[in-house]
Structure formats: C-alpha cells, structure tokens
Amino acid sequence: GLPFDNGASVMAVRSDMIENAGLTVDDFKDLTWSEFEEKAQKVVDANGVPMLTSSGGSELIIEMMQSAGASPVVDGEVKIADNAALKESLTVYKDMVDKGILAEYTDWDQYIASMNDGKAAGVINGCWIMSSVQAAADQSGKWAIVNMPKLDGIDGATNYANCGGASWAVSSNCKNTELAFDFLKSTFGSSVELYDDLLPN
C-alpha cells in the first residue's frame, strides 16, 4: 500500500466569537482540557452558543485518547478496563456536554450547519473539516486553526492526534500486481505536483 494523505487533528475556532469573550486565538493554543474548558465557558457565556460542535460519534473521544498515545483496542483486543486515557476522555467529554460547551449532532448535515450557521464557536476534527468550515462565505476571515487540547494527568499526553487519512492499496486478487504497484509508484508515489493538484480539490 501507499499512504495518500493524513487527517491531522485541528481545532478550528471562530476568532470573532473568541474576541467577544475578551480572549484571543492565541489563548486557545497548547492547552490542557481543563484550561480549555475554563476559557471555552467564557466564549459560551459571551456568545450564547457552544464552544464546540460534534458529530455525536466517538471521533472526538478517540482523538483525545490518541493524543495521549492510547486506544480502546490494544493488540487487537478491546481494552476499556483500567484505561486511564479512555476514562479521562469520557469524563471531559461528558463534562463539556453537561456545561453546554459541546453540542452533539447525530446528523452530519446538522453538524456541518452548526459551523456554517454560527451555532458553535469551534470544532475539533481531522484537517479535512476545513473545507466544511470554509463553506460559509460570510464567515471568511473569521476562522483560525490551533492545536487541540491535551488530557490532564495522563503520561505522554500531547496536543496532537489524527482523524482519518487515506491509503492506496493493491488487492490480493489483482491480476497484475507488478503493473499496479508500478502505477502507484510512478503517479501518487513520486509526483509532488499531482498531490498539489489533487489535495486542495
């Protein structure tokens, strides 16, 4: 296989809503989740909308765990007992929902609309979410990108994770694997220009 792109996690924030709370975008860089919640509450209070929007799935919880090098699956086995990063991630997530800092949407279109309609001051997801964030022309220049918060009290916690990405692969039933590998190598595997042309679109 051949890696194609990476969905590095980002936090996209509305700079205008942050400024309404007397804060700056820089105030949201390199935070722990407890520091984030404190600042996010000010944004919620100043704007009357949640700081973050979520698609209601496990993406954000997985990103939180991943940022600390943890996973709910270890060596192919589900590991939820004695998983400190999972426990802390769930605690933070629930706390944000309870405080109105995080809004959950189970419908993808509503999730995207919450960003575009000003119903949230930010979102954490893979960097691919930026195209959705940029869809509202009237918000041009009002969004900024920072790194995500890191878990408090968890060894190895960082402000970085991944959500998504893509790879090309040659299946085992390919009739001409050598030709297929050569195609991948000579196109996606060796052409920066092709990447530059494909990825923005």
Annotate each predicted stretch with a short phrase:
Residues 1-5, 9, 19, 34-78, ...:
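Extracytoplasmic/periplasmic solute-binding protein
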Residues 30-37, 103-117:
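Short helix-initiation/N-cap motifs at beta->coil->alpha
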Residues 57, 108, 125-130, 164-166:
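Beta->alpha turn/N-cap motifs
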Residues 9-13, 65, 168-170:
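Short glycine- and hydrophobic/aromatic-rich loop-to-beta-strand nucleating segment
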Residues 16-28, 99-101:
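Aromatic-glycine-rich donor-binding/catalytic loop that engages nucleotide-sugar donors
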